[in-house]
C-alpha cells in the first residue's frame, strides 16, 4: 500500500487545497440546519417578511457555497486521480518490460495485464473516493454529532449509541473483504489466461474442432470467478442493508423519544426538525464511510498485487567483469541450466562461435535449442558454467547493453498493428533504404511491393492478414535491419518453403563477413551450410562439427538428415 500511495506525493499540495475547499463546503452544509432552526424559532415568530427573506437568502447562500465548493474540490480530485493512475500505470508497465524472463513467467502474462488494468482501476477509484468523501464524511459525522449534542443531549446520545455497532460491522466486513477480493483478482487472472490462450490459438482450435473442449475450460474458470465474486459480493453487499437497519432503528428511537420530550416541553418541534436533518447528514456520512471501506477492501488487494510487481528486485544484474576472456564472438563453457531447479534443461554445453562465422543448432522438440538462445541473450542466467560475449563474461553486460549487438527472429514473434515499415524498423533509427535492404535479404521484397500500399500497408494485430511465410520473412527482415553484428534465427524459417529458405541462406552467406549468424532449426537443410553445427538431444550435446563430420559421427544428425532429405543426397 505504501509503495502505491507514494505516487500521491507529487500532488500533496493540490490535494491539501482540495481538502481545504471540501472542508469549507462541508461546513457550509452543516450550517444549513442551524439557520433553519433560527428561522423556525425566531424569524417566523416575528412575522417580519424582511427577516424571513434575509435569512432565507442566507440559507441559499450557504447551499450555493456548499455546492460550489464541492464541485471545485471534486474537479481537483478528478485531476489528481487521473494523473496518479496515469503515473502508476506507466511505471507498472515499464516495470513489466524490465522484469527478468523468469519473473515474468512467475507472475504470468494474464496476471500482469490484470494488474495494469483492473487493479490500477480499483486503486484509482479509492483515491477518488477518499478525496471526495475522506474529508467530507468525517466532518459531517463529527460536526453533526457535536451540534446535536449542543442542541439536545438526550436525543444525541440515542443516535450515538448506534454508531459503535455500525463501526464494528464496517471494520469486520472490510477485513474479510480484503481477503475475498484478493481471491477474485486471482480468478480474474485465470480467466484472462484462458481467454488469451483461446484467442491466440483460435485457428488451431477451429482446425482441430476443439471448441467444446475450450468451452469447458472457459466454463471452469468462469465458474470459479463467479463463485469468488458471489462470496465477496454476498458479504460486502450485506453492509448497506444492515447499516440501514441500524440507522432506521436509531431514527425510530430518536423519533419516539423526541415525541415524548416535546410532549413534556423538554424540547421543541423546531429543534427536532433540525435534529432530524443532522441525523440524515450523519446517516449519509456513515453510508459514505461504509462505501469507502468496501472500496478499501478492493483497493488493498489490488495495491498489494501492484506493489508485488513494483517491488520485485532485478535478478539478472550487471556484475563485475570476470577474468575469463575469449577471442570469439561467443564462447560457452560447461553450461548447465534448469527452469525448475530439478531436471537439467541444458547439461554441460561447450561451444565457440568466432566472429563472422555461421553456427547451426539442431535437435528435436524439447532438446534445449531455444533455451540455449535465451541464455545467449541473457533472458536467464545459467546455473553453472560460463558464457563469454564479445570476449567478456555475459554477466558483465545488462540486457540493454547486449541488445544493440543482436538481431533476433523467433518462430512466433509478434507483428504489431502498424505499417510494414514500422514493424521492420521497430523504433530504431533505420532509413527507408535500409528497410528495403532488409526486406530484400529476407526474401520479402516482392510480396511487400505487391501489397496495396507497399511499406505503408498497415498490418492487422499479429500480422493475421499475411500468410505464415510472409510473417516469418518480415520478422527476419526486422532482425537483419541495420546489419547487427550477431544475427540469431530461432526456428525463424520453419514456415518457409525449401526454395525460399535456400535463397535466404544464400543471401546470408553473401554478408557473412558483416554478421555472425546463429541458426536454430529442425531442418538439416537450414544448417547444413553452417561452419559449425551443434546437435542437441534432451539438453545434452550429442554432436558438434561440420555437416560432413556429423554425418559420419552423429547418428541423431544422420537420422534427421536421412528422414528429411534422403541419405543418398549426402553420400
Report each predicted region and the residues it spans.
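ABC transporter TMD-NBD coupling linker
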Residues: 199-203, 279-341, 381-384, 388, ...
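ABC-type nucleotide-binding domain
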Residues: 325-571
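A short amphipathic helical element positioned immediately N-terminal to and/or at the very start
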Residues: 1-10, 112
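An intracellular "coupling" helix at the cytosolic face of ABC transporter transmembrane type-1 domains
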Residues: 9-13, 77, 98-102, 118-131, ...
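Helix-loop-helix
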Residues: 47-53, 147-164, 231-305, 309-310
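Transmembrane helix-loop-helix hairpins at lipid-water interfaces of multipass membrane proteins
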Residues: 15-72, 76, 149-154, 265-269
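Hydrophobic alpha-helical transmembrane segments of ABC transporter permease domains
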Residues: 20, 24, 28-32, 69, ...
